[in-house]
């Protein structure tokens, strides 16, 4: 699984739980419309699944 994922924060983390904010920070997403490129790993996929309503993922 050496593919990369482009993850964009499309909704703000305001009003979300601290765990949710921690997951976003763990992926490097700090502001709306910020895009990061991360390796496609099971750990990253798990974080994406927990914050799926806040992010957009491109493979």
UniProtKB/Swiss-Prot annotation:
One record GO biological process: translation
GO cellular component, one term: cytosolic large ribosomal subunit
SS bond partners: none
CDD domains: Ribosomal_L30
A GO term for molecular function: structural constituent of ribosome
Key words of the record: Ribonucleoprotein, Ribosomal protein
PANTHER family: LARGE RIBOSOMAL SUBUNIT PROTEIN UL30M, MITOCHONDRIAL RIBOSOMAL PROTEIN L30
Protein name: Large ribosomal subunit protein uL30
Gene name tied to this protein: rpmD
